[in-house]
């Protein structure tokens, strides 16, 4: 038995997390050579099917025991999902070898995109401060909703975004006071920046502010320099400019009881108490297992501060105005700590009534002022990579953090999903086009009743038509109203939607089968719909004891 050839393509990546039409994107192919002699690159080609996107010949050498990355720009004019195949021909020791590797690019329509600006100009934590470059998962999630995240790396970029109609939301995470560079240059918002952000919100833009625990300001360089404005004070200047009654506390949220139960640090908190807010729609809480992540979606709040409200005079108040909606409450055992001993945290931070005789600290809240955009305030960066897991499977058998669902609800509000009628989807003959449909389930999923289900799929129907959706797991049944997102595909002559996401959004009366003729059956005009046909069977074909046609 010979040894395996240690030569080929290790990876193909795209430099753009949200590819869009009409915009060049860089695709990089990394080659590896673990053999003892160099390998010449005879050619490299990028193609979608038979369409060549880019190609080159005699482009270099992959050194022995080394790697080489080759990058090329490609672009697309039509929004759809593309499978791009990289084909590389390598020559080593007089022999040629051909290697291929695919990358799937979900190219969005540039005209449908909206933008979220993420401030990176103030050493913002999780962006350009500590844990920098930790917003990628949120950016990838945003792309699924035709939303692109853009880091605003300078003051000019931040101000420009505030007047750009493509931008619908700004995210301002806490300006670091922990990073060494930030301690030397503790950045705050200029008068011009505050005015621009206020104008953005007044024009309907959503502004999200996140804090961080004053544990990350408990350093001699800060303690010995009263001129350094703390993170909470810096963020609160923005909130004041917006006319908001919400504030971020200069404190840390600790919990002795839950940290002991969970075996974590006192500031590593998992909250499970939610307010009445669209942001928490669909968040799962099992009253019988409120702390068990096998049953409940908890809110991850790491190293965070609390959130409170001020009255008309700017003084802390334990009464929330009608404009404010609590989103996430702390546990009843959670308390405020003044870690940096500046007298601003601790027992004087207001709590808010969650239930009778049960007032709690707030971890997150929103405010809707008349005629303005939404304001969302959190004591920590709830959308960082650590809180927004890329997929549920990242957590094994446990449920995902509710942060993920909160971000989904936020993105839906920023750019509502465009629902396409099923007839339009059926009319699309080219594979790879992404659509979202809503309709009534007309066949049970195997997860609900295997005896009456098709294999790993369901049919969904609206007023214009029906279509097969594959693959589908879960207990979806006849009469459920579902929202399905997927790409067009054809299987044995039948158009279908290759499902990327499906959710139940209601229930209704099951669809009544449409009475049709054999002509309609044969011409495909009712393909995918629930029908009934009257007539006589004159023939059928069997295979493995089952009727095939």
Please annotate each region the language model reported.
Residues 16-23, 63, 428-432, 525-527:
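Short, solvent-exposed loop/linker segments at the N-terminal edge
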Residues 22, 78-82:
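Short tyrosine-centred short linear motifs in exposed loops/low-complexity segments
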Residues 417-549:
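OB-fold single-stranded nucleic acid-binding module
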């Amino acid at each position: 038995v010979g040894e395996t050839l240690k030569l080929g393509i290790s990876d193909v990546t795209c430099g753009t997390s949200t590819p869009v039409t009409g915009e060049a994107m860089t695709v990089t192919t990394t080659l590896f050579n673990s053999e003892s002699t160099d390998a010449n690159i005879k050619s490299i080609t990028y193609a979608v099917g038979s369409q060549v996107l880019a190609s080159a010949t005699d482009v270099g050498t992959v050194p022995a025991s080394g790697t080489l990355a080759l990058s090329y720009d490609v672009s697309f004019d039509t929004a759809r999902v593309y499978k791009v195949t990289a084909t590389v021909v390598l020559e080593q020791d007089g022999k040629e070898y051909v290697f291929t590797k695919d990358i799937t690019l979900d190219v969005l329509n540039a005209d449908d995109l909206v933008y979220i600006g993420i401030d990176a100009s103030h050493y913002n934590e999780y962006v350009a401060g500590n844990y920098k470059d930790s917003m990628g998962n949120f950016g990838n999630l945003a792309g699924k909703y035709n939303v692109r995240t853009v880091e605003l790396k300078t003051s000019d970029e931040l101000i420009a975004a505030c007047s750009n109609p493509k931008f619908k939301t700004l995210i301002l995470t806490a300006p670091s006071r922990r990073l060494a560079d930030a301690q030397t240059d503790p950045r705050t918002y200029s008068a011009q920046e505050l005015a621009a952000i206020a104008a953005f919100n007044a024009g309907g833009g959503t502004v999200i502010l996140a804090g961080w625990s004053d544990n990350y300001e408990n350093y001699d360089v800060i303690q010995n320099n009263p001129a350094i404005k703390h993170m909470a004070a810096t963020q609160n200047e923005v909130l004041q400019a917006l006319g908001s009654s919400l504030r971020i506390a200069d404190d840390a949220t600790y919990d002795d009881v839950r940290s002991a139960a969970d075996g974590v640090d006192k500031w590593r908190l998992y909250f499970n108490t939610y307010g009445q807010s669209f942001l928490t729609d669909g968040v799962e809480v099992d009253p019988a297992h409120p702390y068990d992540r096998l049953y409940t979606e908890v809110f991850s709040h790491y190293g965070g501060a609390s959130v409170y409200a001020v009255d008309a005079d700017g003084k802390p108040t334990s009464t929330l105005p009608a404009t404010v909606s609590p989103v996430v409450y702390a546990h009843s055992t959670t308390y405020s700590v003044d870690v940096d001993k500046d007298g601003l945290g601790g027992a004087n931070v207001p709590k808010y009534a969650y239930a009778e005789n049960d007032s709690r600290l707030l971890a997150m809240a929103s405010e809707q002022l008349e005629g303005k955009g939404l304001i969302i305030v959190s004591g920590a960066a709830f959308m960082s990579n650590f809180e927004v897991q890329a997929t549920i499977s990242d957590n094994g058998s446990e449920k995902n953090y509710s942060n993920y669902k909160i971000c989904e609800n936020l993105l839906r509000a920023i750019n509502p999903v465009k629902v396409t009628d099923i007839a339009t989807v059926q009319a699309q003959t080219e594979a790879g086009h992404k659509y979202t449909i809503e309709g009534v389930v007309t066949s049970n999923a195997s997860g609900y009743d295997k005896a009456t289900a098709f294999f790993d799929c369901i049919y969904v129907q609206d007023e214009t038509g029906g279509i097969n959706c594959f693959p589908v797991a879960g207990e979806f049944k006849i009469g459920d109203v579902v929202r399905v997102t997927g790409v067009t595909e054809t299987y044995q002559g039948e158009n279908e939607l290759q499902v990327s996401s499906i959710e139940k959004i209601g229930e209704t009366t099951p669809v009544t089968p449409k009475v049709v003729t054999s002509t309609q059956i044969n011409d495909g005009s009712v393909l995918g719909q629930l029908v009934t046909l009257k007539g006589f069977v004159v023939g059928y074909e069997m295979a493995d004891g089952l009727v095939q046609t």
